[in-house]
Amino acid sequence: MQKVVAIVGPTAVGKTSLAIEIAKKLDGEIVSGDSMQIYKEVAIGTAKASREEQAEVKHYLVDAHSVFEDFSVKNFVDEARSAIGEIAGKGKLPIIAGGTGFYVNALLNDMQLGDKEEEAASVDPEWEVFLAANGPQALWEELNKKDPEAAKKIPVANSRRSLRALSVISRTGGLFSKQQAEIKPRYDYLIIGLNSDREAIYQRINQRVDLMMEAGLLEEARFVYEHRAGEHQVLQAIGYKEFFPYFAGEASLETCVMALKTASRRYAKRQLTYFRNKLPVEWYDPLTDPNCANRIAVRIEEWMKEEK
C-alpha cells in the first residue's frame, strides 16, 4: 500500500512552512489539502505557499482551477490521487498539507463520494417529501429512531446529511453508522498534526489577517464580491464574505476586519474538533518546540520503515 504523509492543523499554525521543510528533508512533494487553494484567482485570503516556496518544492492542486468552475470533494480526491501517483512514480514521498479536514479524510480513506448530480440522485425522494412537509427537526428525529449512532454525529440543522443517511438506511436495510465505520484506508498513511496554545494560535490568526490586509486582501475580496452571482464555492470562503457588508455600504472596514478575525478563530476551533474526532493524528507543537521539524522528520523516517 502506498505510503502518504499528511500534515494538518488549524489555520495559521504553520503547516505550509513545516511541510516544505519536511519535503526538503525527506525528498517529498506536496499536495494541497485545502479546498480553496485550488482556485487561481484568489491567493492572499487562501494563504497559499508563495511562488518562492513553490519553487523550492513542487506543489500540486494549487492554482489548478478557476473559481468559476464547479469543483467538488470528489473532483479533489480524483486529482489528488493522480498527484500522489505521479509523486510516488518519481520515487518521492507524497505529503498532503492542509486544513480542510473532510477533504483530507476523503482522500486518505475510501469514502463514498459523488458529484452534485450523483449526490442529488442518491437521496430518496420519499425523505425529501418528508423533509418538505415536516422540517429538519422531524427528519433528524426519524434518523435518531432508526440509527441513534448516526444521529449523534449529524447536527439537526444539517438536513442534507440526514437525508443521505436515511436514504442509505432505506436502500440497504443496514445502519448508516455501521457502513461509515467500515470505511477502509486508501493509503498507508501517517497524519502529523500541528497545534499549540489556543491563545498563541489566536494571536497568529490576528497577525495573519493584518498582514493579509497589507498584502491586498480587500481587493481580492472585492473581486469575489463583484462575481458573487452564481453558487461558486469561493463565495463561502472565510476571508471574503466578511467584507461583503463593507462593499454594500452596511458596515465599516474595521468592523469587517474584526469579523474576519473572529470567523478565523472559530474556524480554527472547528478544524481541531474535526481532526481530533475523525482522524488518528499524532500531535506536535511547532510554536514552542524549536526542534519540532527534526522530530517529525525522524518519526516519518521510522514510520517509512514499518511494514503494513
From Swiss-Prot:
<dbReference type="GO" id="GO:0005524">
    <property type="term" value="F:ATP binding"/>
</dbReference>
<dbReference type="InterPro" id="IPR027417">
    <property type="entry name" value="P-loop_NTPase"/>
</dbReference>
<keyword id="KW-0808">Transferase</keyword>
<feature type="site" description="Interaction with substrate tRNA">
    <location>
        <position position="100"/>
    </location>
</feature>
<feature type="region of interest" description="Interaction with substrate tRNA">
    <location>
        <begin position="34"/>
        <end position="37"/>
    </location>
</feature>
<dbReference type="InterPro" id="IPR018022">
    <property type="entry name" value="IPT"/>
</dbReference>
<keyword id="KW-0547">Nucleotide-binding</keyword>
<dbReference type="GO" id="GO:0052381">
    <property type="term" value="F:tRNA dimethylallyltransferase activity"/>
</dbReference>
<comment type="function">
    <text>Catalyzes the transfer of a dimethylallyl group onto the adenine at position 37 in tRNAs that read codons beginning with uridine, leading to the formation of N6-(dimethylallyl)adenosine (i(6)A).</text>
</comment>
<dbReference type="Pfam" id="PF01715">
    <property type="entry name" value="IPPT"/>
</dbReference>
<protein>
    <recommendedName>
        <fullName>tRNA dimethylallyltransferase</fullName>
        <ecNumber>2.5.1.75</ecNumber>
    </recommendedName>
</protein>
<keyword id="KW-0067">ATP-binding</keyword>
<comment type="subunit">
    <text>Monomer.</text>
</comment>
<feature type="binding site">
    <location>
        <begin position="9"/>
        <end position="16"/>
    </location>
    <ligand>
        <name>ATP</name>
    </ligand>
</feature>
<keyword id="KW-0819">tRNA processing</keyword>
<dbReference type="InterPro" id="IPR039657">
    <property type="entry name" value="Dimethylallyltransferase"/>
</dbReference>
<keyword id="KW-0460">Magnesium</keyword>
<feature type="binding site">
    <location>
        <begin position="11"/>
        <end position="16"/>
    </location>
    <ligand>
        <name>substrate</name>
    </ligand>
</feature>
<comment type="similarity">
    <text>Belongs to the IPP transferase family.</text>
</comment>
<dbReference type="GO" id="GO:0006400">
    <property type="term" value="P:tRNA modification"/>
</dbReference>
